[in-house]
Amino acid sequence: MKPRSAAPLLSGLLVLVSGCTVLPSTAEKQARTESTRLGQVLHGADQPLPAPHAPLADYLRYAVLRHPQVLAAYSDWQASVLAIAPTRALPDPQLTFEADVTDTLMTFMPGLMFDFMTPGKRRAMADEMTAASSLAYRNYVATVLRTAADVRKAWVELAYADEALNLRQASLRALAQSQELAQIDYTTGRGMGTLSESVRLSNDLAKVRSDIAVLEDRQRAARTRFKSALGLKADETDPAWPEIALIATVLPDEGELWRRTSASNAGLAQMRAMADMARASIEVAKKAKTPDFAVGAMADFKADPLMVRPTASVTLPIWREKIAANIAAAEARRDASVARVSAEEINLAAELAQMLYMVREADQMIRFIEQTALPGYERVIATAEAAYQSGMGSPAMIPESRLMAINMRIERLSALRERELAVTDLLLMTADIAPTDSPLSPKS
């Protein structure tokens, strides 16, 4: 009889607890599903190193699937998604115990206590944590895009170093040929070679050899940077170094670039997620007006008949000034986050204009070199060859003219490098830098 007399009260407590359950929201379910799906992509089969002569997209894909900073950002996002469920859950029940002891045990009263926070308050807290998980996802997206941008910049730098080294080696051959011809002219006295010209060429040769040594160091540094951008440690196998010449990337018009920036920029999306989180925190602050309560029961198993002692408590949110201040502070944080979104949009417009200026400046230089300077040097080379064949000029003029053309090609390569670095920043700004099959949600 005694156990049955306490059963109705215990059953009532369990029914009350089950009725206070807050189910996961649609946003929480979507976040959990998407984090699981992307986790399977990131932690799936080992990603092989790109094959020799692989396109840039293969290197980008390898980096965004393997780089530790991407995996760390994903784990942070996953942790924030998993933290939503504990936020909306009830506190753990408490097993209590009370006894009265004199010479003997007078009362023996175990009990069970449940703390209750209203479903509305826990829903608001869950919504705030869901907004925090959205911010964590935006941080993850920014990390993926930044990783891809680092790979592309390292790729541009490596391609520049390789091509510049080849051009400098061609300069060395042209100078060596000029020096040889000038030395023959000076020694035989049959040409127009002079000692000062021979010395000048020797100095130029030494300068080019020094430039080649610098470029070789630059190439080694670029390869190390490229390997690091891929997420490979120093003691891991080197990747197949890309052997693709730099080419100018075609960009959409300025209006389209701004539309993509406004819609997809990672930094702007982070600011907007922070604003959503600040809005959710206002609802949490408002729910502080709602009291919390606790109910439970204790049963004295020494008493006959069995004595059951119900207990209950309730919080009294009477300090209205404190509640109002917390709400006002949350609203101020929301206003600040909204203002930061506007400030970021203004900054992005200025950055877009600056990046486009750098691209156009490089385009102007490349156009001048390709359409004016290099054709002019080709005519100079043809004239020098014709003069030598007719006996009217020195053969040393031919390699010297070729050297000037090579130097101009190096100038073009430098302009193209600066252009592609600016293009990389533009692609990062518009969130177009990662390959199409990156570990990102379609909504990104």
Task: Annotate each language-model stretch with its function.
Residues C20-D92, V141, M192-L195, A234-D276, ...:
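Bacterial Sec-pathway N-terminal export signals of envelope proteins
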Residues T21, S25, R122, R138, ...:
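Periplasmic alpha-helical coiled-coil/stalk elements that build and connect Gram-negative outer-membrane
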Residues L60, A72-T87, T143, A149-A170, ...:
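Amphipathic alpha-helical coiled-coil segments
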Residues L95-A99, L112, M271, F293-A297:
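Membrane-embedded beta-strand positions of outer-membrane beta-barrel proteins
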Residues K2-R4, T21-E28, E411-S444:
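Acidic, low-complexity, intrinsically disordered peripheral segments
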Residues L10-S18:
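Bacterial N-terminal signal peptides
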Residues R61-A72, Q78-P93, M106, P110-E128, ...:
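A glycine-/polar-enriched beta->alpha junction
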Residues E98-M109, M274, A299-R309:
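Solvent-exposed loop/turn segments connecting transmembrane beta-strands
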